[in-house]
Amino acid sequence: MAKAKLVNSPSVVGGVDTHKDLHVAAVVDQNNRVLGSEFFATTRQGYRQMLAWMASFGTVERIGIECTGSYGAGLLRYLQSAEIEVLEVTAPDKMERRKRGKSDTIDAESAAHAAFSRIRTVTPKTRSGMIEALRVLKVCRKTAVAARRIALQMIQMNIVSAPDELRDQIRHLTRMQLIRTLAAWRPDVTAYRNVQDAYRIALKSLARRYLELHDEIADLDVMITSIVDELAPELIRRKAVGYECASQLLITAGDNPQRLTSESGFAALCGVSPVPVSSGKTNRHRLNRGGDRAANSALHIIAIGRLRTDTKTQEYVAKRVAEGHSKMEALRCLKRYISREVYTLLRNQNRQINSTQITT
């Protein structure tokens, strides 16, 4: 579908407040005046109707959308396929909200105003490539790991409170021996009113759940490893960079890392860029507590790994400490350097992938 454009028509900018079942759209003209607002269903037909409605006011130059990673993901993909420029609207205008209050229509108009002025907006992730697939698999793995941990905790708690004769049979086993032994039990399921049989039934159920989740995690690890190897082979070869950290950094950068215009922007996204807090004669910086904390954690793990095994990293931290910095301050500087290294690798790899696709 080509970009919505009418001959000799005025330019308009759209804004969308996204929800689960209905999106609220608004349109502003070349002077940032509201032309109208409307509700649309969160279906492909609804997306088509929304774009046609916006185009009825003029040429749609761009559209600002809230929550492109959740409720607005489907609309984002549709508009990108229609070659419409999309901006993600971040935080609402607090001053405007205090004056006008809050409603879905007001939020849609605010998104349109933000897109018109290009304030409180960022370039959204495309969410249509392999990194989006990686993100979905990683989220699935994370929940499976959490569920497996809970299953193991419940097994251990039940064993602690189980009858002595039952507990004595399994207390000497290692973790996997215990899990496989419990999963192989054949309790009498008709005797569930008996305490000991009820414990056997519960422990067998928990053990089988643990093993199923264990196999599920192993399958997901194979898929995640394959994607990371394909997307970031150079990154995974760097010291102390494992698949868990590499996958998280890829997800943070997104399928279109070119939206990050500088390595300092990537550092800010990862929360490793120092924030200036200077005033008058005071000139200092503080720790950045914003950004993607999962990416920050990945950089921290890489830094700790290099600090333990890499001689150059150890020398760098020792030099910083000798200059009067604390070890934690030296570690923050190290994370900043690692983010620069990661940014360069991801940008170069993205250029290589794009070049290969164009050649093909």
Where are these regions (language model features)?
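Glycine-rich, often acidic, oxyanion-interacting loops/wings at catalytic, nucleic-acid
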Residues: 139-234
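Short glycine-rich phosphate-binding loop at a beta-alpha junction
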Residues: 59-71
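Short, basic/hydrophobic alpha-helical segments
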Residues: 45-62
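Short glycine-rich, Thr/Ser-proximal phosphate-binding strand/loop in the N-terminal lobe
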Residues: 22-45
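Basic, amphipathic alpha-helical segments enriched in Lys/Arg and hydrophobic/aromatic residues
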Residues: 322-360
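Gly/Thr-rich phosphate-binding beta-strand-loop-beta motif of the actin/hexokinase/Hsp70
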Residues: 5-29, 111, 144, 248
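Short alpha-helix plus adjacent loop in nuclease-associated cores
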Residues: 80, 86-124, 132, 136, ...
